[in-house]
Amino acid sequence: MLRLAPTVRLLQAPLRGWAVPKAHITAKPAKTPTSPKEQAIGLSVTFLSFLLPAGWVLYHLDNYKKSSAA
């Protein structure tokens, strides 16, 4: 544990000089509320954009295995 302290200090030294700007977050309601239809479309597009490429790769995994074995 004693050897870990200098290593941690060495890794923290560059981070001390960085100034992170404060985020401007407000708690006001939205100017234009999002309808349930818009929310459903947005969630569907988001999930499909992640799931379709992953499903395509998994479906063609055998082809990848066969082509790399040559």
Swiss-Prot record:
Xref: SUPFAM superfamilies = Mitochondrial cytochrome c oxidase subunit VIIIb (aka IX)
One GO cellular component this record assigns the protein to is: mitochondrion
Record field: transmembrane? 36-59
Main subcellular location: mitochondrion
Compartments it resides in: Mitochondrion inner membrane
Q: Which GO terms describe its biological process?
A: mitochondrial electron transport, cytochrome c to oxygen
Stretches of the chain found on the membrane's Mitochondrial matrix side: 25-35
What topology in the membrane does the UniProt record assign? Answer: Single-pass membrane protein
Decide whether keyword Zinc-finger is in the record: no
Alphabetically sorted, this entry's keywords are: Membrane, Mitochondrion, Mitochondrion inner membrane, Transit peptide, Transmembrane, Transmembrane helix
Residue ranges annotated as Mitochondrial intermembrane topological domain? 60-70
Once renumbered to this chain, the transit peptide range reads: 1-24
> Which pathway does the UniProt entry assign to this protein?
Energy metabolism; oxidative phosphorylation
PANTHER family, A to Z: CYTOCHROME C OXIDASE POLYPEPTIDE VIII, CYTOCHROME C OXIDASE SUBUNIT 8B, MITOCHONDRIAL
Kindly state the subunit structure of this protein.
Component of the cytochrome c oxidase (complex IV, CIV), a multisubunit enzyme composed of 14 subunits. The complex is composed of a catalytic core of 3 subunits MT-CO1, MT-CO2 and MT-CO3, encoded in the mitochondrial DNA, and 11 supernumerary subunits COX4I1 (or COX4I2), COX5A, COX5B, COX6A2 (or COX6A1), COX6B1 (or COX6B2), COX6C, COX7A1 (or COX7A2), COX7B, COX7C, COX8B and NDUFA4, which are encoded in the nuclear genome.
- Family, per entry: Belongs to the cytochrome c oxidase VIII family.
Its biological purpose is as follows:
Component of the cytochrome c oxidase, the last enzyme in the mitochondrial electron transport chain which drives oxidative phosphorylation. The respiratory chain contains 3 multisubunit complexes succinate dehydrogenase (complex II, CII), ubiquinol-cytochrome c oxidoreductase (cytochrome b-c1 complex, complex III, CIII) and cytochrome c oxidase (complex IV, CIV), that cooperate to transfer electrons derived from NADH and succinate to molecular oxygen, creating an electrochemical gradient over the inner membrane that drives transmembrane transport and the ATP synthase.
User: What name does UniProt use for this protein?
Assistant: Cytochrome c oxidase subunit 8B, mitochondrial
Q: What is the lineage of its organism?
A: Eukaryota, Metazoa, Chordata, Craniata, Vertebrata
